[in-house]
């Protein structure tokens, strides 16, 4: 197929998908939100129309391979950092120390590891292919569920994830956010009406899947990774079948990867300070503090209590607990 034929095919697929999504929206529950004019509930989770199109696209067209790696999370839970770490550990033989020409120095992690719900034809030829997703586990494409591909899910404390989402949406200057108070956004967040929400359902379903199918899904906590990066990068590498050798560890390969992928280092790179993604989004929007417990600088005690109350209610009957 020629390049022009491929482009035409892609446009036809997208056109059909937009029409299908418009027809579907009329039958779905909807809720006003600060994240978009309306969010629509599909398979138990809430999406603005453009993100729902991406979910439908992936469900219809994404074909997973047994060697694929899928990095999953709900937004603002360490996605960017996880992408950089996994990309670096998988490709460490190609880009060895000194890391003076590593792709992460000139490319944002979201450029190197794309979303399966993105509008592209998933034509990566390299193996393993690395993708990311915010799609809930129950809505993943059937090919992901049926194949032997590996899924790594990153979870973050809901208060820190909320604050990160708040700043992210403000930076994007989403029109629905104009004049929105944090109190309003907390209310939407706690009732589940946020992008890919309810937050707690998203986390718990992946956690349950990781316990029922531990060879398929690995569940990691952002906070534990921040506190013990070497241990968790080694665990992830082992889960994916790319364990570090003793020689690599002695030669500082693991340490170099962690330094390269640190949020402090990535945020200072020109590509992440001044760059833009293909959709026009500024790359600097993906980097803030990334601190554990940073919510204390933003949330009032009452708002923190409201999120904690929802968390307690959502975890009834489960032995899962968030970090801090």
Swiss-Prot record:
Its EC number is 2.8.2.-. 3'-phosphoadenylyl sulfate binds at residues 76-81, 156, 164, 222, 288-290. GO terms for molecular function: flavonoid sulfotransferase activity; sulfotransferase activity. Disruption phenotype: No effect on sensitivity to salicylic acid. It is found in: Cytoplasm. It comes from the Eukaryota. Keywords: Cytoplasm, Transferase. GO terms for biological process: flavonoid metabolic process. InterPro entries: P-loop_NTPase (IPR027417), Sulfotransferase_dom (IPR000863). Disulfide bonds: none annotated. The active site is at residue 134. Pfam families: Sulfotransfer_1. One of its GO terms (cellular component) is cytoplasm. Belongs to the sulfotransferase 1 family. Sulfotransferase that utilizes 3'-phospho-5'-adenylyl sulfate (PAPS) as sulfonate donor. This is Cytosolic sulfotransferase 13. It comes from Arabidopsis thaliana.
